[in-house]
């Protein structure tokens, strides 16, 4: 099993959580960053990589909007 730590902007946490539930990925909230992002640890198998890429893309889209 692989693990990925993702910093999720608060503005997209609901959408992020929906994707986690949709793909039934094991996850844990680890804390928050100084910037107010929520640190989420996601555990996944190799076959679930595409779901993790989707999560990362969502976060990147919201992060790009902030810049």
What is the predicted function of each stretch?
Residues 1-34:
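N-terminal acidic leader/helix
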Residues 27-32, 57-67:
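Conserved short beta-strand edge segments in small beta-sheet-based binding/regulatory domains
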Residues 6, 20, 38-42, 55:
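Hydrophobic beta-strand residues in large extracellular and virion-surface proteins
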Residues 9-13, 44-49:
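Helix N-cap motif at beta-to-alpha junctions
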Residues 19-22, 51-61:
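Short amphipathic alpha-helices in soluble, non-transmembrane regions
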Residues 31-48:
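BRCT (BRCA1 C-terminal) domain core and associated BRCT-interaction motifs
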């Amino acid at each position: 099993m692989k693990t990925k730590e993702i910093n999720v902007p608060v503005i997209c946490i609901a959408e992020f959580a929906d994707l986690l539930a949709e793909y039934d990925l094991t996850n844990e909230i680890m804390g928050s960053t100084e910037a107010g992002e929520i640190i989420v640890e996601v555990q996944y198998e190799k076959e679930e990589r595409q779901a993790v890429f989707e999560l990362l893309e969502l976060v990147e889209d919201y992060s790009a909007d902030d810049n």
